[in-house]
């Protein structure tokens, strides 16, 4: 007689084993109809599995986060059901849930096309309408092998090989189609309604390019039709803002197969990069950082001492010379300690803040590379603060102010903050962990900031704070971080002399604001849709001549504007002025200055903004004044 305790504390007694669906039915028919799965003593299970013992039970519906994930996972199985009905010689690989959706990797000799995607989606819709029950079969490993051998499912058999002998394996039966999964899944396809197959792409079994090539079908699913429509609108907007498309359209950068994950910056993109670097450099100088530069290739002995060789060797690019092995640096911190170690340091010298625009290389898998967002060569706005334990709070507090100042400069006003604390496996005494976590907590609380605690998510060498931006599409980008490190200064023998004339190891704070220049510029391209605020724009103003008579004045003004430190260009082609204005607008140049006979007579320009607003007639001094005001505002929304 299991006693079931519900979330409100009420209890229900059943005479025999009971399922989640039966519990829901005992509460009400409406709840039973909405039930997707359940949580039994905090473990998700299928709605039709029996509960034999006293348990705490939560009923899961599509309103719950777990509910929508179960719906998405069930849709992945529906892809398998549909493609197996349509095509022969198909073998199913894996079909997990991902953020906002799902995918299935499939082996097929036939290459899927967009027309196939439509065909598969139509078949899924047809299957859904039959409202069939999804059965769960809990079988032994031997039975699972037999089932998938009969179906010639090579990839499923490989997965089963890795499963321990003991215990049962969950198989899910969609009419004639059988798949394998931890589950849970929906009990009936009536719960599967609002979905869309999105795209096709290539992949490899286990993500290894030496394995079989697979085809991946992506989809999304939601509890309500409106949620699906809203998501598809966001996807459409995101595609419009895709930094890879805009980067090509506006000649900002490109990537070639000969150098995967490494950026060829075009003049327009490099201008943005340089403006960004100049701004960060000014901020660092104002906050008493010392800018340094360290080598690209460093003998592996340093990486062995720092611990990176053991943990990150596979992610490093290496080279050899004169019987020595070098790693192209994947991060800057060990090199920064080498600089700190030059010369004796006193407690009076601390804190020491060393900053570098450090070019790093990491051997990311080719399948994970994504434009500017995931690259193999990137530049960090990296800095390391060497300080005493009692200085941690003040340094973190100052850095938080710096982060908010920079993000607001670019128009990011919504910042998400997370504090990650000690993991189970860690170095350092409990006392120093207590002090560090308290320092980080106080630094946040003293500023009345909202933040989220992530217990156990800190690195083994210290707690950290992460700063994430929310963009115009409500996407979250983790960029900034400040990380306490007790370990590396000890490993690499960084010391200072304290007030008692004793040698001590400093605490090292790893910190970055942008994260990497490449990724941050990618975020900015999408945030602004390449309509950069004037301070960042590759060209800030373009001068257009109405007729050939005005070309000389255009060229003269262009020279004067550039000589005054602005970025200007001209369009003196023999084209109609309307065409030139359209071209300048498409090029996303913030200010468009037209010079005709009238303007030339009064030594001025007719100025308009990128959005078409007529700003009026400006002589050069007034134009400079306006441009300075706009540049000073940068990208701030206030």
UniProtKB/Swiss-Prot annotation:
Zn(2+) binds at residues 333, 384, 510. GO terms for biological process: threonyl-tRNA aminoacylation. Homodimer. Binds 1 zinc ion per subunit. It comes from Prochlorococcus marinus (strain MIT 9312). Residues 1-61 form the TGS domain. This is Threonine--tRNA ligase. Residues 242-533 are annotated as: Catalytic. Keywords: Aminoacyl-tRNA synthetase, ATP-binding, Cytoplasm, Ligase, Metal-binding, Nucleotide-binding, Protein biosynthesis, RNA-binding, tRNA-binding, Zinc. GO terms for cellular component: cytosol. Pfam families: HGTP_anticodon, TGS, tRNA-synt_2b, tRNA_SAD. The gene is thrS. InterPro entries: aa-tRNA-synt_IIb, aa-tRNA-synth_II, aa-tRNA-synth_II/BPL/LPL, Anticodon-bd, Anticodon-bd_dom_sf, Beta-grasp_dom_sf, TGS, TGS-like. It is found in: Cytoplasm. One of its GO terms (molecular function) is tRNA binding. Its cofactor is Zn(2+). It comes from the Bacteria. Belongs to the class-II aminoacyl-tRNA synthetase family.
């Amino acid at each position: 007689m299991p006693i079931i305790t519900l979330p409100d504390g009420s209890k229900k007694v059943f005479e025999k084993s009971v399922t989640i669906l039966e519990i829901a039915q005992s509460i009400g028919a409406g709840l039973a109809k909405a039930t997707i799965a359940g949580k039994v003593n905090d473990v998700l299970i299928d709605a039709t599995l029996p509960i034999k013992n006293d348990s705490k039970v939560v009923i899961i519906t599509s309103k719950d986060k777990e509910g929508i994930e179960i719906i998405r996972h069930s849709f992945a199985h529906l892809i398998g059901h549909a493609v197996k009905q349509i095509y022969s010689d198909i073998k199913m690989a894996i079909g997990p849930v991902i953020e906002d959706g799902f995918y299935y990797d499939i082996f097929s000799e036939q290459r899927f096309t967009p027309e196939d995607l439509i065909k598969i989606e139509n078949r899924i819709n047809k299957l859904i309408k039959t409202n069939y029950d999804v059965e769960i079969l809990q079988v032994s490993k031997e039975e699972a092998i037999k089932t998938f051998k009969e179906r010639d499912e090579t990839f499923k058999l490989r997965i089963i090989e890795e499963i321990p002998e003991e215990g049962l394996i969950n198989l899910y039966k969609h009419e004639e189609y059988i798949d394998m999964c931890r589950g849970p899944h929906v009990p009936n396809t009536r719960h599967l309604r609002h979905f869309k197959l999105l795209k096709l792409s290539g992949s490899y079994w286990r993500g290894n390019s030496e394995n079989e090539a697979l085809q991946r079908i992506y989809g999304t699913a939601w509890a309500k039709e409106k949620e699906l429509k809203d998501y598809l609108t966001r996807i459409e907007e995101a595609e419009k803002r895709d930094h890879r498309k805009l980067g090509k359209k506006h000649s900002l950068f490109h990537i070639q197969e000969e150098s995967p994950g490494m950026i060829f910056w075009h003049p327009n993109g490099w201008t943005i990069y340089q403006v960004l670097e100049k701004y960060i450099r000014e901020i660092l100088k104002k906050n008493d950082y010392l800018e340094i530069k360290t080598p690209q290739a460093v003998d592996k002995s340093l990486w062995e001492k720092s611990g990176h060789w053991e943990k990150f060797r596979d992610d490093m690019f290496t080279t050899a010379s004169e019987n020595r092995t070098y790693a192209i640096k994947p991060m800057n911190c060990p090199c920064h300690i080498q600089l700190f170690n030059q010369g004796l340091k006193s407690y009076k010298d601390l804190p020491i803040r060393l900053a570098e625009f450090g070019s790093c290389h990491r051997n990311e898998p080719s399948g994970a590379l994504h434009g500017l967002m995931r690259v193999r060569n990137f530049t960090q706005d990296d800095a390391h603060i060497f300080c005493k334990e009692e200085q941690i709070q003040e340094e973190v507090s100052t850095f938080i102010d710096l982060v908010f100042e920079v993000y607001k400069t670019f128009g990011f006003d919504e910042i998400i903050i997370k504090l990650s604390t000690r993991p189970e496996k860690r170095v350092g005494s409990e006392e120093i962990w207590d002090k560090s976590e308290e320092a980080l907590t106080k630094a946040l609380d003293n500023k009345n900031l909202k933040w989220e605690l992530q217990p156990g998510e800190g690195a083994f060498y210290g707690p950290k704070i992460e700063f994430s931006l929310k963009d115009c599409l409500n996407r979250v980008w983790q960029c900034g971080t400040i990380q306490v490190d007790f370990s590396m200064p000890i490993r690499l023998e960084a010391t200072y002399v304290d007030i008692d004339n004793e040698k001590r190891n400093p605490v090292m704070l790893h910190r970055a604001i942008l994260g990497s220049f490449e990724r941050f510029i990618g975020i900015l391209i999408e945030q602004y849709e390449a309509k950069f605020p004037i301070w960042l724009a590759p060209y800030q103003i373009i001068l257009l001549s109405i007729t050939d008579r005005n070309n000389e004045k255009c060229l003269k003004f262009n020279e004067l504007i550039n000589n005054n430190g602005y970025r200007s260009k001209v369009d003196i082609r023999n084209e109609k002025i309307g065409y030139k204005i359209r071209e300048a607008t498409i090029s996303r140049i913030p200010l468009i200055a037209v010079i005709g006979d009238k303007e030339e007579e009064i030594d001025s320009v007719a100025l308009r903004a990128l959005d078409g607003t007529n700003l009026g007639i400006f002589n050069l001094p007034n134009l400079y004044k306006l441009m300075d005001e706009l540049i000073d505002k940068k990208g701030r929304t206030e």
